[in-house]
Amino acid sequence: MLAILYDRIRPDERMLFERAEALGLPYKKVYVPALPMVLGERPKELEGVTVALERCVSQSRGLAAARYLTALGIPVVNRPEVIEACGDKWATSVALAKAGLPQPKTALATDREEALRLMEAFGYPVVLKPVIGSWGRLLAKVTDRAAAEALLEHKEVLGGFQHQLFYIQEYVEKPGRDIRVFVVGERAIAAIYRRSAHWITNTARGGQAENCPLTEEVARLSVKAAEAVGGGVVAVDLFESERGLLVNEVNHTMEFKNSVHTTGVDIPGEILKYAWSLAS
């Protein structure tokens, strides 16, 4: 039996439930906040479960559940190692660098003065991101030294571990869009353009989804990026730049509600069939 782990039911999760029923897959919904996780014990909520699909909005909650099920010998999509690699932008960048994949110039500083020095060395504008976050939140396009100094001071005052790590990337000029590629297992199954007049193109921030031709180059780079973080079911974000395609991010609990109609691909069905193929 397939367990779909969740902490909030979004349209994406509803689509997964509906497709599981349509495909005739035996499944159960497991609400993670109410799941007792006692090591060495399998709770009644997991009776008969042979594989799990992790769909929690909370990264820490999903990671904890994935670790627990893995300890019980239940395969989880995605594996804890993949969640860790994708959930931390610096970890993602390091994994991509180790795999030799093209990405925007990236650096991390743990000190305000070093962060300022790196921004100056990169040249303005630069992009400052939290190492943990999604939906394009808390991203800043820093246009000059005065803005950099003010932003770094604000982050220091805010406190919190993620504001003490300064993740810095070069600003990449894009053609008003980026590319999101959906990778399931060893296959890139669909891709969309995310268009926006704003430099942040996330659909959660108002970007518009359009079908993107899944070229061999796009598919090959996306699958390699997925493999770099450990594989499974991920969404790979690509930039089109003067240097060619660059991998910007890899997302481990991808949203697809705006992409099924756009691409004509049964993304939830593909995810479910892949997860079911891993049942122990």
Curated annotation (Swiss-Prot):
Residues 93-276 form the ATP-grasp domain. The keyword Lyase does not apply. The keyword ATP-binding applies. Its EC number is 6.3.2.43. Its cofactor is Mg(2+). ATP binds at residues 89, 129, 133-139, 169-180, 194, 202. It catalyses: [amino-group carrier protein]-C-terminal-L-glutamate + L-2-aminoadipate + ATP = [amino-group carrier protein]-C-terminal-N-(1,4-dicarboxybutan-1-yl)-L-glutamine + ADP + phosphate + H(+). One of its GO terms (cellular component) is cytoplasm. This is Alpha-aminoadipate--LysW ligase LysX.
